[in-house]
Amino acid sequence: MSRPRFNPRGTFPLQRPRAPNPPGMRPPGPFVRPGSMGLPRFYPAGRARGIPHRFPGHGSYQNMGPQRMNVQVTQHRTDPRLTKEKLDFPEAQQKKGKPHGSRWDDESHITPPVEVKQSSVTQVTEQSPKVQSRYTKESASSILASFGLSNEDLEELSRYPDEQLTPENMPLILRDIRMRKMSRRLPNLPSHSRNKETLSNETVSSNVIDYGHASKYGYTEDPLEVRIYDPEIPTDEVKNEFQPQQSISATVSTPNVICNSVFPGGDMFRQMDFPGESSSQSFFPVESGTKMSGLHISGQSVLEPVKSISQSISQTVSQTTSQSLNPPSMNQVPFTFELDAVLRQQERISQKSVISSADAHGGPTESKKDYQSEADLPIRSPFGIVKASWLPKFTQAGAQKMKRLPTPSMMNDYYAASPRIFPHLCSLCNVECSHLKDWIQHQNTSTHIESCRQLRQQYPDWNPEILPSRRNESNRKENETPRRRSHSPSPRHSRRSSSGHRIRRSRSPVRYIYRPRSRSPRICHRFISKYRSRSRSRSRSRSPYRSRNLLRRSPKSYRSASPERTSRKSVRSDRKKALEDGGQRSVHGTEVTKQKHTETVDKGLSPAQKPKLASGTKPSAKSLSSVKSDSHLGAYSAHKSENLEDDTLPEGKQESGKSALAQRKPQKDQSLSSNSILLVSELPEDGFTEEDIRKAFLPFGKISDVLLVPCRNEAYLEMELRKAVTSIMKYIETMPLVIKGKSVKVCVPGKKKPQNKEMKKKPSDIKKSSASALKKETDASKTMETVSSSSSAKSGQIKSSTVKVNKCAGKSAGSVKSVVTVAAKGKASIKTAKSGKKSLEAKKSGNIKNKDSNKPVTVPANSEIKASSEDKATGKSAEESPSGTLEATEKEPVNKESEEMSVVFISNLPNKGYSTEEIYNLAKPFGALKDILVLSSHKKAYIEINKKSADSMVKFYTCFPISMDGNQLSISMAPEHVDLKDEEALFTTLIQENDPEANIDKIYNRFVHLDNLPEDGLQCVLCVGHQFGKVDRYMFMSNKNKVILQLESPESALSMYNFLKQNPQNIGEHVLTCTLSPKTDSEVQRKNDLELGKGSTFSPDLKNSPVDESEVQTAADSSSVKPSEVEEETTSNIGTETSVHQEELGKEEPKQALCESDFAIQTLELEAQGAEVSIEIPLVASTPANIELFSENIDESALNQQMYTSDFEKEEAEVTNPETELAVSDSVFIEERNIKGIIEDSPSETEDIFSGIVQPMVDAIAEVDKHETVSEVLPSACNVTQAPGSYIEDEKVVSKKDIAEKVILDEKEEDEFNVKETRMDLQVKTEKAEKNEAIIFKEKLEKIIAAIREKPIESSVIKADPTKGLDQTSKPDETGKSSVLTVSNVYSSKSSIKATVVSSPKAKSTPSKTESHSTFPKPVLREQIKADKKVSAKEFGLLKNTRSGLAESNSKSKPTQIGVNRGCSGRISALQCKDSKVDYKDITKQSQETETKPPIMKRDDSNNKALALQNTKNSKSTTDRSSKSKEEPLFTFNLDEFVTVDEVIEEVNPSQAKQNPLKGKRKEALKISPSPELNLKKKKGKTSVPHSVEGELSFVTLDEIGEEEDATVQALVTVDEVIDEEELNMEEMVKNSNSLLTLDELIDQDDCIPHSGPKDVTVLSMAEEQDLQQERLVTVDEIGEVEESADITFATLNAKRDKRDSIGFISSQMPEDPSTLVTVDEIQDDSSDFHLMTLDEVTEEDENSLADFNNLKEELNFVTVDEVGDEEDGDNDSKVELARGKIEHHTDKKGNRKRRAVDPKKSKLDSFSQVGPGSETVTQKDLKTMPERHLAAKTPMKRVRLGKSSPSQKVAEPTKGEEAFQMSEGVDDAELKDSEPDEKRRKTQDSSVGKSMTSDVPGDLDFLVPKAGFFCPICSLFYSGEKAMANHCKSTRHKQNTEKFMAKQRKEKEQNETEERSSR
């Protein structure tokens, strides 16, 4: 029978029992259901149906008839009865029950019991009346048979105590007996099933049966029976039952029909008829069965068959045969539900958690739903009846309803309720799970999910989304069509529920615990309690129960719905558990219930309300309990299913549940909860999870519960301890709490004020305090602050505004400004502006210290500045994390409090899977973090925290080790010297750890800092780094999005830096920012300073007063910072970046230049002395951001300056000597640049200011004139002053410039935005006014020049020295260069100022650009470079000017010279910028060489500053050439030679200078101040080499540029210089036909200042550009010669044009550049000499050129050096000749040609164009350097285009004179950018080629710039790859073209030479 019965089941889809039970039938039936266990088996088989079946199963055995009917209804019963056919179906179905029972005994163990159960379910329904009447022996045997037992088993039954043998417990006992019997027969199966049931029985078998019935009936009265029943039956039954139930449930639907077919309709009808009789007759059996069904209906043996049958019936037969059964089953089902509920509840009570959890989750919910849907009234009444009479309530309809619901075990498994006993057999999948982990994994398997889906399909009437209460609801609404409604929602809900529960359990053990409890035991208890109340009420009346159900349904809030809730509430034990689980939701609902108690908890609970409840109104324990209990019945089951249900998403429900938990606990411990609940608001809008909240708060203590309110981005958090809340609140006061990268607000629900706000306020207060401290410290500058406050309204330049900015964590410029208030602060602030908010704040703290210590702190300020520079790198990350900013701000007060901070070192972090927040959380409990640095690349982290906190943290984690992602963290104290701001120090420490032998001192120049990396951008950056060489090491700071790469060589680092500067790389949306190690610059500066100290008389003075230096630094920083502040503020308006760069130029320049302190001293001294010389007011005045303010506050600024100047004055008193004046000159230069911006911004005001300052400046200049050296330097200063004045008026400019410089410093920041427009106006306005002054100043300059002539070496050295006294701080290699640069910078600064004024818009963009390119050193470096340029140009040019006649050449050539100087300085600045970017490596090398060469440079400076530059490039060649002649040494260095040629040509022949587009521009500039410019260029190149070595690639760039122009684009430095100066000249040259030079300059400036480039581009032709490029491509010598020939030709042409066409124009500018004019005179003299020298060198020293080229090769390491050398031996000679000819002869003609050649070449590949002359040179050099050059060239082109795109357009439009004018503007800008001249010089030289190209084709620049590749200017071919280019260079075609080109160049050189000679 069992098999036949099983076979019918086998037909059922869900008949799992077959598989699990070898007997086949036995597993389904006997699993648990035949016996006491049999019922459980049934409910698994058909959860809904199984429950009813089980009840009938018990009754059916008592009344066989009903059973048969049920059997007929359910084929499973039919099978058992078929096996028991001996009994007539009509025969007392009791008999059938008995025979059945006997058969069940044998087969029931196998499967019949299941079928019997199924039949018995209907029978039970039928039997219920019988039970009511009486039961006979037959009925007893039928009952036994229904449980798969025989009479023999009664003996075992007699062993049970009498008190347990109650009708309610009997099904449980019988199931237990049967399970034991089955376990004996089927040891494997029973043990398996039994274990399973043990695990899931609670949840599955007994729970399922009782679950559904008990939950519906709310029976809690049979706990004892339940206990008895649960122990054995549930386990086996559950296991067996689950499988059979699933299979049965699936099969039952079909078998029901089959059963009907198998059994005569009569049988079924008999059974259906009998049910009433059998039910009444076999009251006990029915009762027992009912009880079992009540308990087991969800899954007991007797009920199992019924379940299967009922399932099938409910699915198929239920409507067919069950239609008749349905009404009875409806009646009986309620009864069976009651009985089952009672029995199960008792069993559960006995089993307690096991059954109760299973039943609560699965059965009760299911039963309730079914019952509610199908037989609400019967169920309700059955409760009363269940207790009073079982039969009447169990109708066939009830049975069908039961059948319509899966068994509780199935439901439990469906809901993924965690079984209480393991191993657990999944009733849906027949898979055994030995552990909870296995069960959780199984829940997530596709098999289980599919089984759940099939279960929903199998029970269409069962809506898994509707919990019992909802079932009632659905019953009311869908009594008629429960299947559809429940069916459609069921899949969704079930999925949600199953997934939700699984997730929950997996998410949090607490939830998990709650869930299982709530699911099985708790639900059972809840249901029991509910059912008790319900049963009571139901017994009272069915309708009330229904009404309750209806109430529950409609409101969906069981809690508020009925008095049962109250009674349930009274039953607290269950409800407390439910409270903990389901109550979580009720917590949401608790408030809701409070607010809307009548509303359904789920519906009523809104996320917002939930949090309100949780946070604000914590319901009393009673209200919570009531709500929870109410919600418990439905809500807890709802917690399972309702969470899945429509009311709330699982997440929301979970949240609600969590909140409920949180509230429950608070309710339990109201005082505790009230104090232990936190409201977390302002959570991330992009989503957050409970885990995120827990992670953030876990460090403070255990978290009892979390309630999420996503709609409001809030969460309620309950901590177990009040102390945790207190510690959290305290922590929040000091540090923001960050969740997923966002600071959140945390407050106690009663307290709405989030503490984060307080925290924010505190940081703001801190900022305020710091701001106030700054203000206090700068009390003298308070007036300025006030003034600047008015101006700060415009640009936020005022410190107060800065403070505000800082408060906002907003504007780096603002913070920089505030920092600027203090000199050291200024520096730090500048860097801070760069770095970002965090670095700014960090700098602030440093600045505060600086304020406290003011000037003495200057040196510390420098260190701080270094830190800030590091911070810059990390600034972005800091900005990214506002907490970091707050921390930084807080650091200041902490520092003020002098709290000892320690660094905690954390190592062994996991590779991935952790966030910075998690590391923060490690330290949060111990105190506020000051800073954190996570080195994800090294799996390490550093946390800066209060020392006490650090100690306790280390001790705690030592005692209680913590692991992260399986890695046990090692937490210890870091060494005391560790500074998180000094990232390089940390990096070097790590390097030493890995490689103790590593030479850390020489490793910094190999560091490349990359900022703004995406989180996953490390690999991309490493790939980028590997393109420039091997990346030896790297350190990735994930929390700062920064990485430091250590490349294999400084050249690689420099190349990468230059490339990334020119071609910013994007990784996703992140634009990488690249910087070099600030220590490299400082080291170079120190070396240069040492050299300067040796060679310069002034440097010793500076060094003699180190205190003064620091003071000077402080004063100079404050003053220079102030101008930069102004610039920065103005720039901040333009762009914070630009302003930051400008400030950094002024402030960071010192920092980089000489550890910031040295260079800062130089700058400070320069500024301070400049302030003295020109009047202290200017510097201070410059501090006020606005010109207006400045003019208004000149007095105030003077006072402020006095404050700052107090230091300055000290220095000045000490440095009263010429050196001081030199320093003043430098400061003037700096100020000039600022003035340029200011003048440009507000010309009229500036003029007034200038006029006000002119006198003092003139006086100062006069004083300077008194000292030759000083006069030289001062002329530089005067020149600088006049440089703007030259545009305006040289003389006025001189005095005004000093004033204007200071004013401009202030104005520049403020007006830099307006600088461009204003510059034009100022130029126009001031040119006139300053012409007179310019003339006077020219005379002075001429005198100075004469003095220089007399003491060229001395003054050069002296100049270099004083400048370096000042510059020493800035750069070591600048010792010679610095002086040259100082003077040249003065000139170039003046020129730059002029250029700036002339092309105000361009100049503005140029300085900002240049500054942006070379952030730190540009302003000062520009000034120095300009000074050097001018000094070199002066000294070298003065020599030449002396030769050519300074006065005449000055007066005549001054316009041209001014343009040239501008161009040169501009070029230099541009080139320096470019070169610093591109050729930092070369610069470094050269700088090192220069360090050794400074004396030579000094000599060369005395001989020729160009020579000094040459010395910078090649000390040997420089020495030889310097001994030969000033010009020869220039030629001795190939680049120098080129520069010399260009400069000489330009100096000698403005027209020649014009001829050479690249160097022609320089030449034009040189014509304006040709020799000085060219010399400056060369010297700049030379100096720029050391300078860049020092940290400013700009100085080294000239030589390097010369060298690397061939080798790399950096050769363009000269071009850049020329371009910078010639951008001014460009405008002039545009007006004049000499714009070719301008083109170069513009191109170079375009690199530096894009606007000028387009103009030049327009002028230069591609052919000329190509020619120039070809020349340059050859080698440094070739390039130098060729460029000189070409450039000189162009320069000569342009210079001539400038002189001719632009002289008038320039003459107007000449007043601006009186010093420049002097420089021009000097340059011209020098250019004459130098040019003569160049010609001599060219003619005499092609060999020298080759030697120079060889030297260049050595320095540049060009592969083509040999080839180039060979070619240059012949080609260079020819080139030299060509250069001479070009310089002399090919002015206009060749100028055009070369412009064409150079321009295309330049635009495409500056570096390549350099190689162009010699294919070998191109191949070797360019192979090495072309990538850099090309990139640099293109990048400069980009810059040209970008910065000067509009000017480039203008270039085409304006006349050549206009171009020259614009060029002069660009030059000024470039000069302003001279801080970056090294890079830009090289770039400019290279980019001058590129720029000439750019000039010719402004549009091409854009295209060429973004596109990487190599362009052969000689062949006009473009190659995308370096190899292709190299191959091309080696090709015969290229060689032939090169030869042709060289031949042309030779001719041009000859022509140029002739022209130059004639021009001389």
Swiss-Prot record:
<feature type="cross-link" description="Glycyl lysine isopeptide (Lys-Gly) (interchain with G-Cter in SUMO2)">
    <location>
        <position position="291"/>
    </location>
</feature>
<feature type="compositionally biased region" description="Low complexity">
    <location>
        <begin position="783"/>
        <end position="802"/>
    </location>
</feature>
<feature type="zinc finger region" description="Matrin-type">
    <location>
        <begin position="1876"/>
        <end position="1906"/>
    </location>
</feature>
<dbReference type="InterPro" id="IPR033096">
    <property type="entry name" value="ZNF638_RRM1/2"/>
</dbReference>
<feature type="region of interest" description="Disordered">
    <location>
        <begin position="463"/>
        <end position="673"/>
    </location>
</feature>
<feature type="modified residue" description="Phosphoserine">
    <location>
        <position position="1661"/>
    </location>
</feature>
<feature type="compositionally biased region" description="Polar residues">
    <location>
        <begin position="60"/>
        <end position="75"/>
    </location>
</feature>
<keyword id="KW-0832">Ubl conjugation</keyword>
<feature type="compositionally biased region" description="Basic and acidic residues">
    <location>
        <begin position="76"/>
        <end position="89"/>
    </location>
</feature>
<feature type="region of interest" description="Disordered">
    <location>
        <begin position="352"/>
        <end position="373"/>
    </location>
</feature>
<feature type="compositionally biased region" description="Basic and acidic residues">
    <location>
        <begin position="1518"/>
        <end position="1527"/>
    </location>
</feature>
<keyword id="KW-0479">Metal-binding</keyword>
<feature type="cross-link" description="Glycyl lysine isopeptide (Lys-Gly) (interchain with G-Cter in SUMO2)">
    <location>
        <position position="775"/>
    </location>
</feature>
<comment type="subunit">
    <text>Interacts with FHL2. Interacts with CEBPA, CEBPD and CEBPG. Interacts with MPHOSPH8 and TASOR components of the HUSH complex; leading to recruitment of the HUSH complex. Interacts with SETDB1. Interacts with HDAC1. Interacts with HDAC4.</text>
</comment>
<feature type="compositionally biased region" description="Pro residues">
    <location>
        <begin position="19"/>
        <end position="31"/>
    </location>
</feature>
<feature type="modified residue" description="Phosphoserine">
    <location>
        <position position="615"/>
    </location>
</feature>
<feature type="compositionally biased region" description="Basic and acidic residues">
    <location>
        <begin position="888"/>
        <end position="899"/>
    </location>
</feature>
<comment type="function">
    <text>Transcription factor that binds to cytidine clusters in double-stranded DNA. Plays a key role in the silencing of unintegrated retroviral DNA: some part of the retroviral DNA formed immediately after infection remains unintegrated in the host genome and is transcriptionally repressed. Mediates transcriptional repression of unintegrated viral DNA by specifically binding to the cytidine clusters of retroviral DNA and mediating the recruitment of chromatin silencers, such as the HUSH complex, SETDB1 and the histone deacetylases HDAC1 and HDAC4.</text>
</comment>
<feature type="modified residue" description="Asymmetric dimethylarginine">
    <location>
        <position position="54"/>
    </location>
</feature>
<dbReference type="Pfam" id="PF12171">
    <property type="entry name" value="zf-C2H2_jaz"/>
</dbReference>
<feature type="compositionally biased region" description="Basic and acidic residues">
    <location>
        <begin position="565"/>
        <end position="583"/>
    </location>
</feature>
<feature type="modified residue" description="Asymmetric dimethylarginine">
    <location>
        <position position="49"/>
    </location>
</feature>
<keyword id="KW-0597">Phosphoprotein</keyword>
<keyword id="KW-0488">Methylation</keyword>
<dbReference type="InterPro" id="IPR000690">
    <property type="entry name" value="Matrin/U1-C_Znf_C2H2"/>
</dbReference>
<feature type="compositionally biased region" description="Polar residues">
    <location>
        <begin position="1806"/>
        <end position="1818"/>
    </location>
</feature>
<feature type="region of interest" description="Disordered">
    <location>
        <begin position="1550"/>
        <end position="1583"/>
    </location>
</feature>
<keyword id="KW-0862">Zinc</keyword>
<feature type="compositionally biased region" description="Basic and acidic residues">
    <location>
        <begin position="1936"/>
        <end position="1960"/>
    </location>
</feature>
<feature type="modified residue" description="Phosphoserine">
    <location>
        <position position="418"/>
    </location>
</feature>
<feature type="modified residue" description="Phosphoserine">
    <location>
        <position position="1864"/>
    </location>
</feature>
<feature type="compositionally biased region" description="Basic and acidic residues">
    <location>
        <begin position="1484"/>
        <end position="1503"/>
    </location>
</feature>
<feature type="compositionally biased region" description="Polar residues">
    <location>
        <begin position="1442"/>
        <end position="1459"/>
    </location>
</feature>
<dbReference type="InterPro" id="IPR022755">
    <property type="entry name" value="Znf_C2H2_jaz"/>
</dbReference>
<feature type="compositionally biased region" description="Basic and acidic residues">
    <location>
        <begin position="468"/>
        <end position="483"/>
    </location>
</feature>
<feature type="region of interest" description="Disordered">
    <location>
        <begin position="1930"/>
        <end position="1960"/>
    </location>
</feature>
<keyword id="KW-0678">Repressor</keyword>
<feature type="compositionally biased region" description="Low complexity">
    <location>
        <begin position="618"/>
        <end position="628"/>
    </location>
</feature>
<keyword id="KW-0539">Nucleus</keyword>
<feature type="region of interest" description="Disordered">
    <location>
        <begin position="749"/>
        <end position="804"/>
    </location>
</feature>
<keyword id="KW-0805">Transcription regulation</keyword>
<dbReference type="InterPro" id="IPR003604">
    <property type="entry name" value="Matrin/U1-like-C_Znf_C2H2"/>
</dbReference>
